A protein has these predicted regions:
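A noncatalytic interaction/capping subdomain that flanks phosphate/NTP-handling catalytic cores
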Residues: 1-145, 160
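Conserved glycine(s) of the Walker
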Residues: 152-153
């Protein structure tokens, strides 16, 4: 079994999988020594597409719902006439089970596993807020954050300071 540990925002995540997972260059600076993680993500592959309940929140290709103490996140891609393409995560406390459709077995990456697990939701449950930002540090030592979606000019604005 492959096991990789990564540390983000003071939280160590262990990713475990029976199949190889590609390391992501974007995640490389956060790679951590194997140790006791605060959260474990276990990846497996299966083409059994979960059926969200009618009460699930649905936006585009994403469904979210709670079932008791479990948080569910389903992202479905593709069309019904092709093999299933989806990621599905169930989080119970400090453990997340992630299922990728078999179509993703080749090329599954650390970054894709973290995103499928709903890492931002995991942080939110710990009282942490994640912002997509560019930043500068002023001469006085103050930080200025430019937050917003990709492509709106955060880095461009930061470069003008």
């Amino acid at each position: 079994m492959q096991r990789e540990c990564y540390r983000f925002g003071g939280v160590t995540f262990a990713i475990e999988a029976d199949a190889p997972i590609e390391r992501s260059r974007m995640c490389a600076p956060f790679h951590a020594a194997d140790g006791a993680p605060e959260h474990t993500i276990r990846l497996h592959f299966d083409d059994g597409l979960p059926v969200p309940p009618e009460t699930a929140q649905h936006r585009g290709a994403v469904w979210r719902w709670q079932s008791g103490m479990e948080r569910h996140l389903l992202e479905q891609y593709g069309t019904p006439d092709k093999p299933p393409q989806f990621t599905y995560a169930v989080t119970r406390g400090a453990h997340t089970e992630v299922t990728f459709a078999n179509a993703y077995r080749a090329g599954a990456s650390v970054r894709a596993v973290l995103e499928a697990a709903g890492i931002f939701d995991i942080f939110a449950e710990r009282g942490m807020l994640v912002l997509h930002c560019a930043y500068i540090v002023t001469v006085a030592g103050e930080a200025i954050l430019f937050s917003g979606p990709s492509g709106v000019g955060k880095s461009t604005q930061a470069a003008l300071w």
